[in-house]
Amino acid sequence: MSYINIPDDVVSKYSDDLKTFTQKAGEIPSSKSLIPQTAYTIAALKTKLKFWEVTAKDDPTIASDWAGVCTAITAGTFSATNLKTVCELAFNLRKPHETGNVFIHTVPSDWTSSISTDSVDTTPIPATESDATLSTVSAAVQSGAAEDAATKAKAISFLCCALIRLSVKEPSHIMTAITSIRQRFGSLYGLASATLNAITFTRQQLSRIKQGIETYSLARGTIFYYVRYADTTYGSSDKSYGVCRFLLFQHLELEGMHIYKMILALLTEWSTVPIGLLLTWIRNPKSALAVVEIKNIITNFDKAGVDKSWKYSRMIDNTFFLNISSRRNVYMCALLASLNKRHVPQGVGDYADPRNIAVIKAMDAAVKNQVAIDVTLVERIYEKYLISAGSTDAGTAYTLSRGTKRPNPAVFMSHQQAEGHPTKKRTWKSMVPPPPTLQLEDQQQRRLSPELCEDCFSELLRGKHHRILPPPVIPSSSSEVLFSKSRIMEISGGCSFDPIGF
């Protein structure tokens, strides 16, 4: 049915008897409307925040408090009281390079109203997993001289900070990360800890801690307050920032803001591309609110000298920055996830593939195929951008391997010039070699058209959109379609750039 032409004017034309019915879903009370996003401000956040104030503990107290936590974890009596102790131990983290604590400070007067003085629940927290298999101990337990109190205190607080990751991670994460936790403690502090080497957990035990964090808003508030304090206080060149980055920041920041997180990751690799241009390349009709929110973040929050509360605010209220969540931007999320997988170095395990996000896995196969096409198109736009920008960022080998010469600025007329000369002759070049074959889920291999109009591609880079023509029917005997010049010339001005290609 793709060959049927749909006139432009019919898509917005109402039937005569329905002209006054212009309501959209959000304007019909009984419709299944989305939960509205809450506008983020620090003032709005503080009205919802309560946290436990953490005070300094000496080394022997840290050791004795940890012993009590271990007893409760082992006995299955772990409660909010023990969870509070875990938070206190975590945020008594010692600085790795000098004396003092990373997180302990006098709470400023504009935050003191959020300190809780309520009594803490002592009811045991239920486990949500039944697996009682112990995590592997990969380091030998030290023998000989007993571990000194200072080293033990450092190791306990370091471990408790890692346990705070359960705010956003599953118990299996701690099980598999325990080896790297031991290794990084050694590299940061220049010490080996018998306590840290000997520690073991089960998923069942860790699930109680995770369930406690999810149950008690005071725990989440405490984690939020001290993490945002450290992120706001320490610069990236500070050694305290480094230890916090490993233990907490990289895991907790931008939680639930998948769209923004993946855009930043991609921009790090495509460092010559401005964020506004990247958004122009990847936006779609359903992403309007996400684009507005990203502009809001860039303009008001994600800049030097601004409190970092916004990065962790969804721990307090998950309706903050809701418009950049994956569920509200499934197509853009899938597009960015694929681009991240192909161009951004990934971790290991469950987090090695950003396409494992649940909403992407649930996408229809046909929609995934369209995403794959758009991914290839964005990659081609990026390569063209590097070359057409006329900078030295695209080296000789890079440009030659893509069959394109570095352009003389005179060759590429400006967008305004092109519009002023609609009848000028267009210059066509074939990509040599042609673009890489795109592997689709139905295992058919089809190619995007290798014929491009340089001027219209330049317009596309600037955000000018062309009408997309219906795709041709593919002969059963061929898996490769090359557009005829007549079809390419159908659009006004003599050029059609059809990103579908099949």
Curated annotation (Swiss-Prot):
Organism name: Taro vein chlorosis virus
Pfam families per the UniProt record, alphabetical: Rhabdo_ncap_2
Keywords linked to the UniProt accession: Capsid protein, Helical capsid protein, Host cytoplasm, Ribonucleoprotein, RNA-binding, Superantigen, Viral nucleoprotein, Virion
Taxonomic classification: Viruses, Riboviria, Orthornavirae, Negarnaviricota, Haploviricotina
UniProt name for this protein: Nucleoprotein
Primary role: Encapsidates the genome, protecting it from nucleases. If expressed without protein P it binds non-specifically RNA and therefore can bind it's own mRNA. Interaction with protein P abolishes any non-specific RNA binding, and prevents phosphorylation. The soluble N-P complex encapsidates specifically the genomic RNA, with protein N protecting the genome like a pearl necklace. The encapsidated genomic RNA is termed the nucleocapsid (NC) and serves as template for viral transcription and replication. Protein N binds protein P in the NC through a different interaction, and can be phosphorylated.
Name of encoding gene: N
GO molecular function terms attached to this record: RNA binding
Family statement: Belongs to the nucleorhabdovirus nucleocapsid protein family.
GO cellular component: helical viral capsid; host cell cytoplasm; ribonucleoprotein complex; viral nucleocapsid
Subcellular location: Virion; Host cytoplasm
Assembly with partners or alone: Homomultimerizes to form the nucleocapsid. Binds to viral genomic RNA.
InterPro entries: Rhabdo_ncap_2
Region of interest (Disordered), residue spans: 415-445
